[in-house]
Amino acid sequence: MADQSLLHSPINPHFFQPILTESRTHLNIPVAFFSKHVEGRNNQNKTVTLRSDASDKTWLVKMDGLKLTDGWEDFAFAHDLRTGDIVVFRLEGEMVFHVTALGPSCCEIQYHTSSHNINDDDRNDQINIASRNSSRVKKNPRKKVESSLDHSRFVAKVSAWCLSNDRLYIPLSFARLNGLNKINSKKIYLQNEEGRSWKLVLRHDKSGMQTFVQSGWRRFCSENGIRQGQYTFKLVRKSAPPVIRLCRAKAKPKQRSVAEYSSDHSCFEGSVTPSSLRNDLLYLPRSFVNSNRLDKRCSEIVLKNEQGVKWPLVLKRFKSVTYLPKGWTSFCQVNRIKAGDSFKFKLVGTWKKPVLSLCPTQSNNHKTPLECSEGNKSEESEEDCLEVKKKKYWSRCRASVENMDDDQTNIGNSSRKKRVSKNPREKVESSSDHSSFVGSVNPSSLYKDQLYLPRNFVSSNFLDKRCSEIVLKNERGEKRTLVLKHFKKDLTFLKKGWTSFCQVNRIKAGDSFKFKLVGTWNKPVLSLCPTETNYHKTPLACSEGNKSEESEEEGTEDKNTSQDCLEVKKRKYWSTCRASAENIDDDQTNIGNSSKEKRVKKNPVKKAESSSDHSSFVANVTASSLNYDRLYLPLSFVSSNGLDKMNGKEIVLLNEEGLSWKFNLKYNQAGKHTYVRPGWSRFCDANGMSQGQQFTFKLVQKHGPPVMYLSLSEHRPKSESSSHRSYFVGSVTASSIKKDKLYLWKSFVSSNGLDKGCKKIILKNKWGREWKLVLKHYKSNCFTIIKRGWTSFCQGNGLKAGDSFKFKLVGTGEKPVLSLCPAESSHEKIPLECPEGIDDVNSLSSNPSSGDDSSRSEESEEENMEDKNISQDCLETKKRKYCSSSSYSQNRFVTLTLTRSAFQTYKLVSFFNNYASRLS
């Protein structure tokens, strides 16, 4: 207790307070100390300054009467104050306090920082509060703190945030011990293991007590193959300019650098980084470029895979850096090279257009590139195939293949190994008689709705001169007419119908096919032959399809008449059904308010929120939130924490590493919803949050500005769709109710085949009532939504914004059925509608005469089609149905049959009047 005399010195007034559980957000000042030394001063309700021996930083804390409020939580967090500790405040000036922290045993807490503590350096790397990483050690002269004497090394954590913001944070302890915190806006050099140097800028932020390097960190990581993880750096020169060298950790396997090359100089090795795929760039090693003189004479270069397919790329130079832009990503996608895979290129041609040949490695020797339907053995056909690949993959492959690659890998993995021929050049080859050809379906052809035909097949059958249409026929004889297009006398392809043909015949990406030419007149016919992948498949049945195809065979002029008629009938029928159902829902909502209140009172514990803790909520990353760059907050969370009264104020989001993002808090009074913006999309990208995932946010500070903490590990709900693809779990958002839309997960849609020809979907609650909604697919943005009825479904089942739900797919086909399962927030809710519903009313009848009355009512409906003013009678009928007293016996049931004419004319009144008069 060397400082005991200072603590009890009568010269400086002081007081002490124990740290309790509620001391996390504020600390009380003793009344005697406040009245003697603080009360009566001009700044008693202003800010006090806190200092400590742990660091040179000062903290500004607001004094609100007898409490230290805003800023105290940061001070306690930085000094690792725990329940049971004691803090001593010594007044040293005008509202300036020196704070000393004591442990539960009244021993002073000693703070120290270890330069080799990986966790400490990780936090120092990105957390603004430096002393939070300090360890607490009791002051005991017999037990000294063991720490390493080598302060020339530090471990840096490379995160996605560091790469996107082009900066590397240096631990504060390392910067202080080596004097880097006193250097600002000076040059610093980073060296890789081979001694190559990169010039960066060293900066020091005094306000946040941070030291970091920038302006070149992203390029250093890209050229040295540094991905997300932990890397060791060593300071090899302290004098200006400082030099820091990259050292690979012994415990981690040696990472292969992009600049690594063999002693031969004709080849070089590297690894694919996420940034190279994202930026579509491949940097070439300087020694490889110089030794082969690629830096002077070349403007183009050709990449060739193991099968001989070539990709011409542009060779760019910027100062001393040589790289390949615009084409590297498509090359990796076609050859199935992913981030983290290693590669090796060999220079096989040194003329004006050099050729880099991809050599087999351990990571790609078992991979087969995406097949090309125009492939051939000759060099000329390879060039044609190259042109096709450029048009098929370069234009939209970057946007489509990333979303489709996972599905393609899962769908066609097992079958693709069997389909690949022994000679990889023979991907799509015409048969010897030129009347048939074999190919495979790739994602680009489905996405662009095009199928390229082999050149020799087209020329041998004279399809390039006289035809503008072609007919595809499946194994059942059903036909579909497509447009035949010719491009520059070299390319021939089918469009406007290829995707729908594959959907109907259940041909997916990765499946192989074989077509045979069976007709060579003005409209040739290609017949689909059975293969290993589709001989067991049955085409989707279409009730109107057979009629339309027969009409095609009978007369080509009326080929689409029945299909168009069917679509018109469907559109007319569903529009009337939706209008009537929405009107009935509104009436039932107004009528059944009192009865609903009685039902809800039976279980008053169940609120809209499943948890009583209003300091946290679960956020869904949806497509709309990413597109509109905003995050909607649940209404209960906002109202309970007073965030609806902070319109236009600033709010801070913290991730698990302590990095902060500032947003604006907006409250829409008309829609009564609160959201944060802008920057939500950037926040999701930096923290690896993707569409369809759920994350927990906790409000850790209510006082301005509010602070919400993101927990990535605490709440990642195990979506039952991942383990069982027939389930879909989500929560109701304010935007989904307002826009009458529900976004479905891509994995749920693709795994259950909902994107294959489905235009309608049925939602069913646990009482059996059904809602018919529209299922809409957006191929350009790769998402699927349910619309025109989602809001009425939520209203009918008592679902509000913030409630969670769970659907199970119980029926497939043209009209799949999603059944609502009981969830935590909705299993006690009773829908506004009775189990008999309005879409399907099937009840047991105890009175046989009711069936006769029903038939009479239907006959009267057919006879009186022009009566329109029955809304009041229908409303009175529903009032009897929902507000009826218990005097009606339970055995009085009736069977109702809802016909299309009933929906169109709103007529059930005749039967209801007869039934009501019979009851009276």
UniProtKB/Swiss-Prot annotation:
Q: Which keywords label this protein? A: DNA-binding, Nucleus, Repeat, Transcription, Transcription regulation
CDD domains hit by this protein: B3_DNA
Basic and acidic residues bias (residue ranges) = 423-432
What is any Pfam family matched here? B3
Record-linked InterPro entries: B3_DNA-bd, DNA-bd_pseudobarrel_sf, REM_fam
Location of the protein in the cell: Nucleus
Which superkingdom, per the lineage? Eukaryota
Please name the GO terms that the record assigns under molecular function: DNA binding
A single GO CC term for this protein reads: nucleus
Regions of compositional bias (Low complexity) in chain numbering: 842-852
Q: Which PANTHER family match?
A: B3 DOMAIN-CONTAINING PROTEIN REM-LIKE 3-RELATED, B3 DOMAIN-CONTAINING PROTEIN REM14-RELATED
Listed name of the protein: B3 domain-containing protein REM17
Task: Tell me which species this is from.
Answer: Arabidopsis thaliana (Mouse-ear cress)
Taxonomy of origin reads: Eukaryota, Viridiplantae, Streptophyta, Embryophyta, Tracheophyta
